[in-house]
């Protein structure tokens, strides 16, 4: 059984540089979008309303909330991880199951 040998002297440097440039552009684009998202969130922080958990009253964002919804919806504040219902179809959080 022969061991596989790799010869790295035949690697095309142009394709390696091209791949590195593409990865750098993608990462830079993601970072720029993230920065612009935070800037937009800072500018719109004082104008949005958020609904408290279990209450339908409108409260002003205090600045401590990680996400602030601008729409007038009845969803809870975006402070945790949302679990879609199709991932855990048998989970019922409101009732306990008997032994």
UniProtKB/Swiss-Prot annotation:
Protein name stated in the entry: Glycoprotein NB
- Which compartment or compartments is the protein found in? Virion membrane
Stretches of the chain found on the membrane's Intravirion side: 41-99
A Pfam family reported for this protein in Swiss-Prot or TrEMBL? NB
One term of GO molecular function: channel activity
Domain of life of the source: Viruses
Task: Kindly indicate whether the keyword Ion transport belongs to this entry.
Answer: yes
Source organism per UniProt: Influenza B virus (strain B/Leningrad/179/1986)
**InterPro entries registered for this protein in UniProt:** InfluenzaB_glycoprotein_NB
Q: Between which residues do disulfide bridges form?
A: none
Alphabetical UniProt keywords? Glycoprotein, Hydrogen ion transport, Ion channel, Ion transport, Membrane, Signal-anchor, Transmembrane, Transmembrane helix, Transport, Viral ion channel, Virion
Q: Which gene is annotated as encoding this protein in its UniProt record? A: NB
* Assembly, per entry: Dimer.
For the keyword Signal, the answer is no
Q: Which family does it belong to?
A: Belongs to the influenza viruses type B glycoprotein NB family.
Report how it sits in the membrane.
Single-pass type III membrane protein
Function statement: Putative viral proton channel. May play a role in virus entry.
